[in-house]
A protein has these predicted regions:
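Transmembrane alpha-helical segments and their membrane-water interfaces
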Residues: 14-17, 60-71, 96-159
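N-terminal hydrophobic segments of proteins, predominantly signal-anchor/transmembrane helices
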Residues: 28-43, 55-118, 422-425
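Long extracytoplasmic/lumenal interhelical loops at the membrane interface
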Residues: 38-47, 303, 315-392
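Alpha-helical transmembrane segments of multi-pass inner-membrane proteins
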Residues: 139-167, 188-189, 195-243, 247-264
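A membrane-periplasm/extracellular boundary helix in multi-pass inner-membrane enzymes
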Residues: 151, 157-161, 262-333, 357-358
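Transmembrane alpha-helices of multi-pass inner-membrane enzymes
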Residues: 210, 254-256, 417-455
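Hydrophobic transmembrane alpha-helices and their immediate junctions
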Residues: 218-228, 252-264, 388-424
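A juxtamembrane structural motif centered on a specific transmembrane helix
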Residues: 273-274, 281, 407-413, 443-455
Length: 455
């Protein structure tokens, strides 16, 4: 039995133990941390699966107990989430059968999507049914995530051989080894920490979500200012140590969006605190940047902080010439003698253009998950959603999440509002609804009712 499976078994036993002891807060806290940080399940012969499948199975068992004990509490938003996501899933199934290239292996795609939906639904149900103080629960979850990621991140940064061995053993499996292979072959050390993930990009998304959550606490809980400030700086520090472009750009975009909302809502008394958060952000950049220079990462600081994190440059790699037809024959016929322009256009094409072209050919319901013409599927939740489910599926998601955002804005639920917007921002550069680390935070967002701390 591998160390991965031993860790997973012990964690699952802890979740079940505290659940049986009716210490639901600890059970849900461990569950939330596990969705983010738990290693992959190693089966043998190089085969591994995401441990979120096992965690979701445990959630289903706990849900059944809730149902049979008649303690389950469900509100409208949770039902709407479950219904909307499953309707979208049905659309993708139809799209695959009608327009796609169906294979037996595609069942895995749909099982993964459904377990994600069930996991988000289950965690939200636990928060409501046991009347947990969700803000206290999530602060504890964030502390656990930060501690584990700094521990592993520091090993990666300062002990390459051990860090690589731990990362490959715990978090790398088939199809997910490209980032660490690139580091191994081209650099020979970790210049970007991976934390408890297979890629620093995922750590960057997690960093941005955590600091967005803590921002609200900084502005509304003066009694715990020092504690919240430490959590904010620590959360941002993880994204910077990962040289995450999403974190570097996103932290300022989120700050601007929050500032605009505060002005629109005339929350003038909070604005000084919001500028205080900006000062903490700049301080963290200076602190982490200085430390990175001191350990010989100066060239990477210059590149990621000032060049690669240019918003226009960051978007071009994915979205350049997205809406233009990628059949260059037409351009050549209409512009005889302009071969150079044709070649240059090909060079600056984003990696999602072919994916978007498939959507344009099947705009109503898409083609389902998987490739039909060797197009790249990934790196954007929005384009992937259009590819997989077409305009219908995109509309379902837009109506649900858009309605939720508007509702939170009107009801001044800023923590949920900006956490949803941060998840949406992450969707610009990755498929956020396929990563288990998003599950606990999305569950927080669909818990609309005010909850009280359980006894």
């Amino acid at each position: 039995m591998t160390i991965n499976n031993i860790i997973i078994i012990l964690v699952v036993l802890a979740i079940v133990f505290f659940y049986i002891k009716k210490d639901y807060e600890k059970s849900v806290c461990i569950l939330g941390i596990s969705y983010v940080c738990l290693p992959v399940i190693k089966i043998g012969n190089g085969i591994a699966i995401n441990s979120s499948y096992l965690l979701t199975f445990v959630c289903v068992i706990m849900m059944l107990h809730l149902i049979f004990s008649k303690k389950i509490r469900i509100d409208k938003t949770i039902i709407e989430y479950f219904a909307a996501m499953n309707i979208g899933l049905v659309v993708m199934v139809i799209a695959l059968l009608v327009n796609g290239n169906p294979k037996w292996g595609d069942i895995i795609h749909f099982v993964g999507m459904e377990q994600y939906i069930v996991a988000v639904y289950s965690v939200a149900i636990f928060l409501k049914s046991y009347k947990l103080d969700k803000k206290l629960v999530y602060k504890k979850i964030i502390v656990g995530i930060i501690v584990l990621n700094y521990f592993i991140g520091m090993v990666q940064l300062f002990a390459w051989n051990l860090g690589e061995k731990i990362t490959r053993q715990l978090y790398i499996y088939g199809g997910k080894d490209a980032p660490i292979n690139t580091v191994s072959n081209e650099v020979g050390r970790f210049v970007r920490i991976f934390g408890t993930f297979y890629s620093p990009t995922v750590l960057g998304v997690m960093s941005l979500m955590m600091l967005t959550y803590i921002t609200y606490e900084l502005m509304n809980d003066e009694e715990k200012f020092v504690q919240n400030a430490i959590l904010y700086i620590s959360s941002l520090g993880l994204g910077l140590l990962a040289f995450s472009k999403l974190t570097i750009i996103g932290v300022f975009l989120i700050w601007m969006l929050e500032f605009i909302v505060l002005l629109m809502k005339r929350k003038f008394q909070i604005i000084p605190k919001h500028f205080r958060t900006l000062g903490m952000t700049i301080f963290t950049f200076l602190l982490i940047g200085t430390l990175q220079y001191m350990i010989g990462l100066g060239p990477y600081v210059d590149y990621y902080y000032f060049k690669a994190s240019n918003l226009n440059v960051a978007m071009k790699s994915r979205y350049e010439n997205l809406i233009e037809d990628n059949h260059m024959e037409n351009l050549e016929e209409n512009n005889q003698g302009r071969t150079e322009r044709k070649e240059n256009s090909q060079k600056v094409t984003g990696n999602l253009q072919d994916t978007f072209q498939i959507f344009k050919e099947h705009p109503i319901i898409g083609v389902g998950p998987g490739q039909v013409k060797n197009e790249f599927v990934g790196d954007s939740e929005y384009i992937t959603l259009l590819h997989n489910g077409g305009g219908i599926c995109f509309a379902i998601y837009a109506v649900f999440y858009g309605g939720l955002i508007i509702s939170y804005y009107l009801k001044e639920k800023y923590q949920e509002l900006f956490l949803l917007m941060t998840i949406g921002m992450g969707g610009i550069s990755m498929m956020v609804f396929s990563y288990s680390c998003i599950i606990p935070f999305l569950s927080f967002c669909i818990c609309r009712e005010k909850t009280e701390k359980s006894n």
